[in-house]
UniProtKB/Swiss-Prot annotation:
GO molecular function: phosphoglycerate mutase activity
Reactions it catalyzes: (2R)-2-phosphoglycerate = (2R)-3-phosphoglycerate
Enzyme nomenclature, EC number: 5.4.2.11
Pathway(s) this gene product operates in, as recorded in its UniProt entry: Carbohydrate degradation; glycolysis; pyruvate from D-glyceraldehyde 3-phosphate: step 3/5
Active site residues of this protein: H11 (tele-phosphohistidine intermediate), E89 (proton donor/acceptor)
Binding site for substrate: 10-17, 23-24, 62, 89-92, 100, 116-117, 185-186
Organism of derivation: Shigella dysenteriae serotype 1 (strain Sd197)
Protein name: 2,3-bisphosphoglycerate-dependent phosphoglycerate mutase
HAMAP family per the UniProt record, alphabetical: PGAM_GpmA (MF_01039)
Entry-linked InterPro entries: His_Pase_superF_clade-1 (IPR013078), His_PPase_superfam (IPR029033), PG/BPGM_mutase_AS (IPR001345), Phosphogly_mut1 (IPR005952)
Residues the record marks as site: Transition state stabilizer: H184
Matching Pfam families: His_Phos_1
Native organism taxonomy: Bacteria, Pseudomonadati, Pseudomonadota, Gammaproteobacteria, Enterobacterales
Gene (name only): gpmA
Amino acid sequence: MAVTKLVLVRHGESQWNKENRFTGWYDVDLSEKGVSEAKAAGKLLKEEGYSFDFAYTSVLKRAIHTLWNVLDELDQAWLPVEKSWKLNERHYGALQGLNKAETAEKYGDEQVKQWRRGFAVTPPELTKDDERYPGHDPRYAKLSEKELPLTESLALTIDRVIPYWNETILPRMKSGERVIIAAHGNSLRALVKYLDNMSEEGILELNIPTGVPLVYEFDENFKPLKRYYLGNADEIAAKAAAVANQGKAK
């Protein structure tokens, strides 16, 4: 049976991951640790014999720079790359920039867990005169007002990620090309939920660690067979648990 592989990588630790802040569409860069995580992901993929024909990422530099570092370690810096806002992190609305633990102290752990992980729960909206509104950012100049979020739930994130998967990424894989996607915790959770037909309750508990390659294997009909992380299982579990704990009061 022919097996097709897809590699997903959540960006390495960003400066705001380090500071435990809600990031969303804010364009913050990788921390030093994040750069190291991205390089380590690339080295691991090279050791495991992976190479690619095409790459996808978001329009946010923490994902773009993660992809750069991964491809550099693979000696595939020349690889064609498509950047799309549809792979951006979920928009966290008025929470963007706030410290997660301080927000949990103010509103309670459960409310913040719902804002972070609830399937259809949207954080408080931005207003259009807020400097954080994406309509003020030139990279989104060609988007309609309807496409520009004031806030997003995971359900709304799925509404943009999955059509992009079905219309753009999957056809390329079906043509025989080997694909890597460098994106974000929630845009990747959106894709995992769809591919695994995961319940709303199941996705609530899924935490994707930074800078760890996540491999999907598909059968000849492009039905997922399995998914697994590359690397040390104990270290990966600890990183995923740390992601879950970010939204708790100190």
